[in-house]
């Protein structure tokens, strides 16, 4: 079942505006390694995180074995570095990704701080705005 996302507004590649969904989450379409994915923005997640199923689909191989501390306990996973990630029109060529997200839809990933920290963020109860950081 595909999740509905509200339109994301991209302003001259300077900023994107992500409206809040009815359930209170911020969702944005994107790509990892050129493969389509739906992100749930998770400001508390250290990294972009994907399922093992999606990693196989996106040819995300190798990586360093790691232990993940999640709200549901410890899990094993892999850390991959220097992966291209696009979210809502912003593309970063070198993002750390964790493989090992479990539960839910394998085509939904968490958009964490390994991506978000590269942007200035403004957040209110209706929208999230990501802006290019001033150099």
Which residues are covered by each model-predicted region?
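Pepsin/retropepsin-fold aspartyl endopeptidases
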Residues: 1-135
